[in-house]
Amino acid sequence: MSIADFFKRRLVRLQPMVIMGMIIGAICFYFQDSILWPTIHEVPIWKMILVMFIGFTLIPVPPTLDIRGWAEMHPLDGPGWSLFYEYIGNILYALFVRKFSKTALSILVFLSGCALIHLAVTSPTGDVIGGWALDSTQIHIGLSRLLFPFFGGILLHRVVNLTTIKNAFLWSSLLIIVVLAMPRVGSSENLWQNGLYDSLSIIILFPLIVYLGASGEIKSKTVSRICKFLGDISYPIYITHYAFIYIYTGWVADTKIKISDAYPYSILTLVTSIVIAYACLKLYDEPVRSWLKKKILK
């Protein structure tokens, strides 16, 4: 496969839903006006539309177009920042990293792992949160969050031979539960401890979870359909859900509602996100990608 073909395939796979995510973000934008983002109602429509069209390209907007006020690369669709870095990873892979030997790739993964640990243990918040703004600090966070998972995944694919592990789904699920059950460790006086926990979870536990999941067997047709559904919807829900999170978060901030009273609205937000994502997948993403494959990848 040529470099040009590789880039075409990545664009066909990712870009249609990038556009849809920005459109949904634009439609929902003015409904997000709240005490968290008190200037939204002052944003002229032409500026919001301009931000939307720039977002179609995933090019980060400059600070002058930060229409939300959160210093986001993509104010209409927050998660777009990570896709921006994914494209950087794809470019690095196509131009350089794909030619690396296993030894060279291992060195790159080791260094990027060290960079991730350094980021986490020296962070003023003791974690790896960030990466969505266009300044030196946030770019450092974004690149550190990109490099190890992206190239570590490539190394894992190259060197690991999958076997069949009994109850792989059970073990991987238990690991996920353990990690999520301990979102933070240590005290506010020792933030480095949580930074070390976060970074080692990313470096050791998450690759292990991926390996276990890939080593399992699916024998039930029902389970197979569920897995396919979750796999198909994962990207659409990722790139479209945040518009509804903005609305929900702003509403909670305005009403100061108790957590116990907010559960129905939380569930409604979750269900809405899933339904919209699935509709986008079936009515837009799959047909558009099929058409693009015939036109561009033939």
Language model region names:
Residues 5, 81-82, 237, 281:
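Active-site alpha-helix of zinc metalloproteases
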Residues 24-27, 112-115, 155-156, 247-248:
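Hydrophobic transmembrane alpha-helices of multi-pass, membrane-embedded glycosylation machinery
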Residues 10, 14-23, 203-204, 266, ...:
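Alpha-helical transmembrane spans of integral membrane proteins, capturing the lipid-embedded, hydrophobic core
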Residues 5-6, 14, 82, 105-106:
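Alpha-helical transmembrane segments and their helix-entry boundary regions
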